[in-house]
């Protein structure tokens, strides 16, 4: 970016700490504002019935480029300038991962295999989202801010190069669902009352019971699930 971005100074840990302290004490300053202030729900292509992409805009350089340590030189390879950018989230991925027991030890961490981007539809959708985001950031409204594209860089143009960049950099946004999915089949963990099959007196009430992802953030649906579960339990107790 040619002009300062609001979050540039907060990449220094001491300044970030002061911003949080100011927010706690005075309810003012950058620490009071969630950085992802702009976003949208979009269709990756015209034939999609309803939005399958969510994008976020952030007024700063992403943390993956590094944190600036106070009073030290910026490490090699870390972007040390103003910037802004965006992220693309696929709302309804077809790829399915798995969680397996590592051993009979109940304290052993499970084996988690996310299996991201394992279907052609997922790769096509993310590629379309990448192109949409790049097009948005190249609009005339950004002209006075535009410097140069730092990530991934203007050399990434072909579909194969875009796919390779996405595969190397894609990550979770921590909205997983479905590990204890609700359903009527034998592979479902809970029934329609969210009771765990084969276990007496146990229910699950969180995002893990969703059979598929909703086309939005998962926090509001999870609150709804909890409220519904409370109603079912109270009705049963009455």
Task: Please give the residue ranges for each predicted region.
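C-terminal structured subdomain/cap of oxidoreductase catalytic cores
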Residues: 1-5, 9, 42-45, 83-144, ...
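Mid-to-C-terminal "cap/lid" subdomains and adjacent gly/pro-rich loops that border
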Residues: 1-77, 136, 140, 157-160, ...
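Low-complexity, glycine/alanine/valine/leucine- and proline-rich hydrophobic stretches
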Residues: 71-89
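Extracytoplasmic/periplasmic, Sec-exported soluble proteins
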Residues: 121, 154-157
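Short, glycine/acidic-rich hinge or "gate" loops at secondary-structure transitions
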Residues: 143-155
